[in-house]
A protein has these predicted regions:
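Short, structured "edge-of-domain" segments at secondary-structure transitions
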Residues: 1-255
Length: 255
């Protein structure tokens, strides 16, 4: 029996916090108009194509080292709530979906864990023909996987690593290896015993830092060349504290 040919067209993959997935036509989607089942909400949207792949990173008591995949072309469309991702993949016992990414086979992701290690992998490296996925990342039992970050191929791309104690380290993306077979990866940032890596970003010239300021108010600050200079170093260094924040929580690429 011949395989059903998928028409290559733009879609937006919509994923809910409780793991319901759907693919809506086009890329002109207003996320504010999306509706979900009672008690559910938006996890994220991914502008991709019907020939691309949806990756699901699972979590369990043994760490989030297993990756599952399904073809975007198999996802339901229309106006409904979609389909639970658990009907498309077979999660290992005790595991739950933790993070998602939908994109082309050639795209590269930065995968990092709270223990401070990380690696680069192409989407094609993470795809499995088995519904049970594949073991890809080596994580300690107490370590968790951070949300995967799209790594742009720009020569000047930089990596930002933010620790729980508010230290920020910035270094060239070229200092991280592409590891097609997975593993533990390289040390991204040097962490003290009680510290952890809480956020990573791949960016060009400027970086958003989000968190709480003095007095507990939500704060967001854009760091450009002058503000970033003190934090630039080599991979596996400790980085420097970020001024002006009571608790920096996230770093995000600008633009």
């Amino acid at each position: 029996m011949a395989e059903l040919k998928v028409i290559d067209e733009p879609v937006t993959v919509v994923v809910s916090m409780k793991g319901w997935v759907r693919a809506l036509k086009g890329h002109e989607l207003d996320a504010a108009t999306l509706q979900f089942k009672s008690g559910d909400a938006l996890y994220g949207t991914f502008a991709c194509r019907t020939v691309d792949t949806l990756l699901v990173f699972g979590t369990s008591s043994k760490g989030a080292g297993r990756v599952y995949s399904t073809a975007v072309g198999l996802l339901p469309g229309g106006r409904g709530d979609g389909q639970p991702i658990t009907s498309l993949i077979e999660l290992e016992s005790g595991s739950q979906p933790a993070h998602y990414f939908a994109g082309a086979a050639t795209q590269t992701l930065l995968l990092a864990g709270t223990g401070g290690f990380g690696l680069l992998a192409r989407v094609s490296d993470l795809v499995s023909r088995q519904k049970g996925g594949k073991a890809f990342l080596t994580l300690d039992e107490t370590e968790k996987l951070l949300p995967p970050v799209l790594a742009h191929n720009a020569i000047a791309a930089q990596v930002a690593c933010l620790s729980l104690t508010g230290r920020l380290l910035v270094f060239p993306l070229t200092e991280i290896k592409l590891q097609p077979k997975g593993g533990k990866g390289l040390t991204l940032i040097d962490l003290d015993a009680k510290d952890a890596l809480v956020s990573v970003a791949v960016f060009g010239q400027s970086l958003w830092v989000q968190g709480t300021g003095r007095g507990g108010k939500v704060k967001e600050e854009l760091l450009r060349s002058a503000g970033l200079a003190i934090h630039i170093g080599k991979r596996a260094r400790k980085g420097k504290p970020i001024d002006g924040f009571a608790k920096p929580q996230r770093v995000v690429a600008s633009g």
